[in-house]
Amino acid sequence: MSLSNLGPGGVHSPLWRWVVERVWRLEHAFERSRAAARPEDDTRIRIFLVMGFFGFCFVGVSLGAGWSALFSRAGQGGGYAQGVEGARGDVVDRNGKLLAVDLAHYALYVDPREVWDAKETRAALGRALPQVPAKRLDKAVFGDHRAFVLGGLTPDEKDAIFNLGLPGVTFEEQERRMYPLGPTAAHLIGFVDSGGKGLAGAERALDDPIRKAAGGEGGPAQLSIDVRVQAALEDELRKAAEEFTPKGAVGLVTNVHTGEILGMASWPDYDANKAGGATDDQRLNRAAASVYEMGSTFKAFTVAIGLDTGVATAASTFDAREPYKLGYRTIHDYHATKAVLNLVEVFQHSSNIGTAMLAERVGGQRLSQYFTNLGLTKPAKVELQESARPLTPRKWDQDTVASTSFGHGMNISPLALAQAMNALLNGGEMRPLTIRKLPPGVRPEGRRVLSEHTSAEMLKIMRANVVPGEGGSGGKADVPGLSVGGKTGTGEKYDPAIRRYNHQRQVSSFAATFPTDGPLEADRYFVLILLDEPKGNANSFGFSTGGWVAAPAAGRVIERIAPFLGVKRKTELVTIANSPKNAAPEAGL
């Protein structure tokens, strides 16, 4: 072993200087005693000195090797220290962008029983650590037991104090979890406790593989999200929240074929580096842990079920000229058309009357079974342990069938809505959502819940609802050239204070997909924007419905993320969308 390895500083290290000093003192002690000693005593003293010298050398080399191993990380500036309690591996996005990382830091301790010169040690620490209160240093240096002095020292700060060569001053290496992007994707990434245990998000869901990665097993945990998509989603969601001041808001982007979550936002958000200082409301992952009555976005499922069961076609008609009386209740349309509507028009005008009539044709048993097949009666299948259980009807009577057909009487999470919408848009196959990146080209095996024909028809119907000038409720989400489709949703919230639904308290959303053209197997994405109790303003003419507050934000998200996802605008669609007859329609439910 070379002398350069005897701890930081090699032969110039404090440890090596200490060994040399001890040998020098022994040598001078020998010189002082030899004059008065008898010859045989002189020989014994020399033997003792030689043995002592080699003993000191052995101790020095051993300690130097140990100290070198202990503090090698500071010199190397990388890697994970084996055996560090709570150590975790890196977390990255689908493109390798760093999302979470362990950074080494050190805690400084003083053991007064091992201090050689208390006054010198106290003075040196006072100069090196001016931020530490004097009383704490006094207690640590002049006390009677080992005491903590300061934590959070960087490797450079630790080395500077170590090189002072102060016996009794020691360090303990610890890991601090850092999130380089701060609040970006905080709800999806999650956070850990002081011991390095995952408490939320991917940190909790993937706790075991992330811990194993710290030991070099399996590499970093790679999530499905794209930070470029995530940043655009969060930015537009924040703008919508600032404009319409809701209680909370949710944004989602998924790949409909793979179930990969490319972006997930919950507002208000928090900085994952300061999770302990965030409020419960900020830490709440509304995309996974909150459930809502989704309102008219459910009409997409009801229409698809009607087509799939064969009780209706796109040309089937429904008389919406008068309110529909069903048992003891009367169903109205928000924007009464007072017309006979075909199925596409029922969807475009978001007709409660037409949708309830369709659900009655389907029947309660079949409707509830389809909802179950679409995953709407169970928590969304995803790694996140926050995934909430829905609130579902106890019985499927005539009133329940009508209510659930247009999104009332069932509370589900936004993730559950996305999972079901994926099946609606990918050719009819149910697949779980995932927060982990899948290998390129891999599409998990799915369970068929709708026919390919039904899925293809729904893509056309959802596109018709967004095409400008066609009278659909989603026109404000259109992006020329990207073939956007979607469905607005405005669900009134039940108010216990008045024991009925309160039209002043709404959950407003827009469920979008793009591109709707091309074959069923073509790449396709789902986008959701949801605002909980938004407030209308002058820009929305006082309306707080999904078509006014959520659809525009969804369109802006799609326009920004399409280039990242490789979706190119098509010139012929730009021409159609910009034709003179296509004035923007009134956005509705």
From Swiss-Prot:
Role played: Catalyzes cross-linking of the peptidoglycan cell wall at the division septum.
Q: Which UniProt keywords apply?
A: Carboxypeptidase, Cell cycle, Cell division, Cell inner membrane, Cell membrane, Cell shape, Cell wall biogenesis/degradation, Hydrolase, Membrane, Peptidoglycan synthesis, Protease, Septation, Transmembrane, Transmembrane helix
User: Localized where?
Assistant: Cell inner membrane
Please name the source species.
Caulobacter vibrioides (strain NA1000 / CB15N) (Caulobacter crescentus)
This protein is called: Probable peptidoglycan D,D-transpeptidase FtsI
> What's a single GO BP term from this record?
division septum assembly
User: Which reaction does this enzyme catalyse, per its entry?
Assistant: Preferential cleavage: (Ac)2-L-Lys-D-Ala-|-D-Ala. Also transpeptidation of peptidyl-alanyl moieties that are N-acyl substituents of D-alanine
Q: What is its EC number?
A: 3.4.16.4
Record flagged with keyword Cell membrane: yes
Superkingdom, natural source: Bacteria
Query: Which family is this protein grouped under?
Result: Belongs to the transpeptidase family.
Query: Transmembrane stretches, by residue range?
Result: 47-67
GO MF annotations in UniProt: penicillin binding; serine-type D-Ala-D-Ala carboxypeptidase activity
Q: Which Pfam families match?
A: PBP_dimer (PF03717), Transpeptidase (PF00905)
Q: Does the keyword Transcription regulation apply?
A: no
Active site residues according to the UniProt entry: S296 (acyl-ester intermediate)
InterPro entries from the entry?
Answer: Bact_Transpept/Beta-Lactamase, Beta-lactam/transpept-like, PBP_dimer, PBP_dimer_sf, PCN-bd_Tpept
Free-text note on domains in this protein's UniProt record: The active site is important for FtsI localization.
Q: Per the record, GO CC terms?
A: plasma membrane
- Topological relation to the membrane, as annotated: Single-pass membrane protein
Assembly information from the UniProt record: Interacts with FtsN and FtsW.
Pathways per UniProt: Cell wall biogenesis; peptidoglycan biosynthesis
> What's the gene?
ftsI
